[in-house]
Amino acid sequence: MSISSNMVKVAVVGGEGIGPEVTAQSRRILDWFAARRSLPMTLREAQYGLIPYLATGKVLPDDTVEAMDEADAILWGATGGPETKEVPPAARKAGSLLSLRSKYDLYANLRPIVASPALSDSSPLKAEVLKDVDFVIIRELTSGIYFGEPRGIEILPDGQRRGFNTEQYTTSQIRRVARSAFELARTRRNAVCSVDKANVLETSVLWREEVMALHREEFSDVELTHLYVDNAAMQIVREPRQFDVMVTGNIFGDILSDCAAMASGSLGMLPSASFGPVDRFGRRKALYEPVHGSAPDIAGKGIANPLGSILSVAMMLRLTLNRPDDADLLEEAVQTALAAGARTADIAGPGAKKLSTAEMGDAVLGALEMVAGRAREHA
C-alpha cells in the first residue's frame, strides 16, 4: 500500500469537535519524525467545518479540496457536533466524510484492534480474554446501505411516514475489499474471517459466494472462515484473540469495530486507515483518522485522548510512507508511555492522574526520545 515517490504530500485536516485538538498532537509527532528521522514529506494544514462555511459557504473550502486532491495521505480529525445545525443540510452533505470516501473511492477501511497490557484494567473485558489480542477489521467503506439508492422518508397513502434504505453490493465491490483482506492476512497470521448475514440477506449471500470464489481462485493458501454478524459480535467479546483479519461490509464493520474497541480499553485508542485503488503510478490515496467521533461534550476542554490519532500516524508511516521501522518506533513509544502510567481521562483508573491532550502528546514525544535512544545504542 506504500507509494514510490520520494516526497510524500500529507494534508492535515483537524475538522470539528475534538478533531483539531487530537490532530495537533499528531502533527507534533510528524514534525518529530521529520526533524529526527528525515521523514520525506510535506505537510499542509487545511480547514473543515463551520468556520470555513461561515467564510466561504462551504464546509470543504476550495483550498482544502486542493490540499486533499494533491495529497498522497490525509490526516483527518473528526466531523460533527452541535455546530452542524448551523450548516444547511445540502452544504453539510456536499462536504461530508461519506462524500470524501466516495470521491476518492476509499473502499478499504483498516481498523487494528490491539489490546495493550498496560490498559488491561481500562477494559471491561477480563485480562485473560485480552491476552494476545491483535487483529484487523477491514470494512468495505464506499458501498452498502450507507450509499445505496433509493433512500428517503415518504408519506404513505394512510398518512404514516416510512423510512427506507437500500443495501446493495456488486461482485467487484466485494472482491476488491476481500482481496485487501487476503493480501493483508498473508503478511500476518494467514487467516481471514468473513462476516455477513447470509442466512437472511441476499447481499450477504452474494458476499459469501464472491469471497469464497476469490479465495478458491487466488488465495487458497489463506485460511478462510465465515461468521454471521451476530455471532461475530459475540465472539469478539468472548475470545477476540481467535481473529487475525476480519472482513465485512460497511454497516457491519462500523458496528463491529466499535464493539471491538473495548478490547483496547477505549474508542479513543483506535486508529484507522482507508485506501483507494492503486493508480497508474502505483500509489493509493489514503485517509488516516482515529475511529472516535467529534465528542462535542468534551470539545475545547483539552482532555481528549490523542492516541487514536497518533497511532493513525503510525499506520501512515507503515502503509504510505513505507517506513515500517519508524511505525514500530512510534507504536513502541505509545506503549512505553502507557506502561509509565500516562493516562487521559477515558483510560484512567480511579485515583489515577489524568493527563490533558497536550500532556499525553508530551508523554509520547518523551517516550519517542527514550525509545529512539535505546535503538541507537543497539544499532
Residue ranges and their predicted role:
Residues 54-164, 251-253:
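N-terminal glycine-rich phosphate/adenylate-binding segment common to multiple enzyme folds
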Residues 52, 237-342:
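Glycine-rich phosphate/nucleotide-binding loop
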Residues 142-143, 148-188, 192, 198-200, ...:
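Glycine-rich phosphate/pyrophosphate-binding loop and the adjoining helix
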Residues 31, 35-38, 70-73, 102-109, ...:
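Generic secondary-structure signature for well-ordered alpha-helical cores
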Residues 36-62, 234-236:
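N-terminal beta-loop-helix "entrance" segment that forms/cooperates
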